[in-house]
């Protein structure tokens, strides 16, 4: 052991130990912290999504209430040829524009989310939905507090209804960072009944690996949904007064209609059964000729999300919406299950998907985050390899020092 240099050995042990500590910090502590900060839903962010549907069918509320704004005069919307008098329905392209913004709250780990959705037919706004809720920034799940609100507006009817504060559950506009291959609970923005959002399979969207998720929202009464939310915050006396209302009055209350508008809406929701049902459907639902029916709106949808799993970014979103008239819940389910689609009973039907600009914008959001994750993984790998190498060197230096000391002890004993 004549070549042993104690000072050099000590310096090597010190340097190796420092490299090990730094390697552990860089390889195992700093990346998780960086990823945690990346996964936090940012405050002050805005997402603009534009959906398009090449073919849609919509109840022509303008012609019913305000002929001066009838989009049937536009080249993009034409009247549907139906056995009913007048231009009761339109067909043509439809647009769905959504803007989602986030803002800070008094809690660092929570963020406010505000969304505005607008359905546009023939250049005219047909429906708007504004909603506000609060999310946990690290999971993108709603907080368990009654802070969520909604406002539905139907411009052709000059009506709007505000849904009082309630507790939102399930995913809605954002997916968790590091999305898993499993089912999630999904809260549709139109009706707030939770439905399963099931993982389907891995796919590729614009060259990027993605997970495909699918949710089906069964037929739900829009009137019942709105009244349920309203009654959930009302006093017992208010609940009793709502229960005493006639179906027409409940319809008027749910949509916030004035008396004149309510009378106009009755023209497309009440009448003899043969006006709304084909002869085969009359037989299916056991209607007699001339039997009066009173219909209400039902909503159903299928949603398909394509999610980049590492960042939770929605790369594409398809939604098939069908809002139609039915007399009751049982009939609505039968219409859906047996595919008894009749344009006369259609309120709104469209198959929406992100347009190319929105897909590109979402890809531009995901790409730099994916690059940062890959860089962190590479840094972590290099740091861990360096740590292992430094540990090997440290062990070798410690063994050499121990052997040197053992040799010195033997020499002293022999002397």
Put a short name on every predicted segment:
Residues 49, 59, 295-299, 408-410:
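Hydrophobic transmembrane signal anchors and adjacent membrane-proximal interface regions, especially
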Residues 184-323:
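Membrane-proximal low-complexity regions enriched in glycine and acidic/polar residues
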Residues 278-380, 384, 391:
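Membrane-proximal extracellular "stem/stalk" segments
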Residues 2-160:
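Solvent-exposed N-terminal domain segments of exported/luminal and surface proteins
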Residues 3-18, 30-31, 371-415:
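Juxtamembrane interface at the cytosolic side of transmembrane helices
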Residues 156-192:
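Short N-terminal edge-element motif at the start of the domain
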């Amino acid at each position: 052991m004549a070549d042993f240099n104690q000072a050099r050995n000590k310096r090597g042990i010190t340097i190796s130990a420092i490299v090990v500590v730094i390697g552990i910090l860089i390889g195992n502590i700093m990346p998780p912290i960086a990823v945690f900060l990346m996964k936090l839903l940012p405050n002050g962010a805005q997402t603009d999504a534009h959906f398009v549907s090449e073919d849609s069918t919509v109840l022509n509320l303008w012609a019913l209430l305000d002929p001066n704004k009838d989009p049937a005069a536009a080249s993009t919307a034409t009247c549907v040829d139906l056995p009913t008098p007048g231009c009761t329905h339109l067909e043509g392209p439809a647009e769905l524009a959504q803007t989602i913004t986030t803002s800070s709250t008094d809690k660092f780990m929570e963020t406010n989310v505000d969304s505005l959705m607008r359905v546009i037919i023939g250049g005219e706004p047909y429906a708007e939905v504004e909603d506000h809720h609060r999310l946990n920034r690290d999971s993108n799940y709603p907080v368990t507090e009654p802070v969520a609100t909604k406002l539905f507006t139907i411009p052709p009817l000059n009506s709007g209804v505000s849904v009082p504060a309630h507790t939102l559950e399930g995913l809605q506009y954002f997916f968790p960072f590091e999305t898993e291959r499993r089912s999630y609970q999904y809260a549709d923005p139109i009706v707030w009944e939770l439905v399963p959002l099931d993982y389907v399979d891995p796919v590729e969207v614009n060259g990027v690996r993605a997970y495909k998720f699918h949710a089906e929202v069964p037929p739900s009464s829009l009137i019942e949904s709105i009244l349920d939310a309203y009654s959930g915050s009302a006093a017992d006396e208010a609940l009793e007064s709502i229960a005493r209302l006639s179906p027409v009055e409940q319809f008027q209350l749910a949509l916030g209609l004035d008396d004149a508008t309510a009378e106009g809406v009755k023209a497309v929701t009440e009448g003899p059964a043969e006006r709304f049902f084909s002869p085969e459907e009359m037989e299916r639902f056991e209607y007699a000729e001339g039997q009066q029916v009173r219909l209400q709106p039902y909503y159903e949808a299928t949603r398909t999300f394509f999610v980049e799993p590492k960042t939770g970014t929605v790369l594409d979103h398809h939604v098939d919406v069908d809002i139609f008239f039915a007399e009751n819940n049982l009939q609505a389910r039968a219409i859906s299950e047996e595919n008894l689609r009749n344009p006369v009973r259609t309120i709104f039907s469209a198959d929406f998907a992100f347009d190319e600009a929105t897909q590109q914008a979402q890809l531009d959001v995901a790409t730099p985050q994916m690059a940062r994750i890959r860089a962190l993984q590479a840094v972590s790998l290099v740091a861990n390899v360096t740590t292992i190498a430094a540990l090997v060197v440290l062990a070798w230096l410690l063994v050499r020092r121990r052997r040197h000391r053992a040799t010195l002890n033997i020499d002293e004993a022999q002397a």
